[in-house]
């Protein structure tokens, strides 16, 4: 069972990266919050890994922080939530804000996450409130500050957001209305687009 990978960051995209470890490339799925913290391609990266084993496949999920990995493992303990949905949840909300929403029973905030309906939000609160209370995560409702982004990253951002469950027409409309500055990063576009989409 792989618990951590350290190697060269051979490739990165908003939802997955490839880590080269002694000539072997490992594809690791990641949440946006981990993507924001990645070094440039060619640099060394080290991630905590959750290994998901199925009959026909092994999938790796990587996290920069222990809190993210712990929350991921707690999320997949909820009935109806698999690894991909758990990853997508953490792409849309920081662990501290998620903890706050669960502890406060904030169904409106939880159900605003793509793929999470009212019933799933209720299950999150019902099944995780006590677990979250015991976790070492300070609840918060703080939101990340928005940034502006260049048009050349729009396709990557749109693809990532569609994979998270947003409708492409809505995503494209939001991206078209965002102010454009050359030199802004993909991470900045994702942050701003998510902030607008979750209003």
UniProtKB/Swiss-Prot annotation:
GO terms for biological process: DNA recombination; DNA repair. GO terms for molecular function: ATP binding; four-way junction DNA binding; four-way junction helicase activity. It is found in: Cytoplasm. Homotetramer. Forms an RuvA(8)-RuvB(12)-Holliday junction (HJ) complex. HJ DNA is sandwiched between 2 RuvA tetramers; dsDNA enters through RuvA and exits via RuvB. An RuvB hexamer assembles on each DNA strand where it exits the tetramer. Each RuvB hexamer is contacted by two RuvA subunits (via domain III) on 2 adjacent RuvB subunits; this complex drives branch migration. In the full resolvosome a probable DNA-RuvA(4)-RuvB(12)-RuvC(2) complex forms which resolves the HJ. The RuvA-RuvB-RuvC complex processes Holliday junction (HJ) DNA during genetic recombination and DNA repair, while the RuvA-RuvB complex plays an important role in the rescue of blocked DNA replication forks via replication fork reversal (RFR). RuvA specifically binds to HJ cruciform DNA, conferring on it an open structure. The RuvB hexamer acts as an ATP-dependent pump, pulling dsDNA into and through the RuvAB complex. HJ branch migration allows RuvC to scan DNA until it finds its consensus sequence, where it cleaves and resolves the cruciform DNA. Belongs to the RuvA family. This is Holliday junction branch migration complex subunit RuvA.
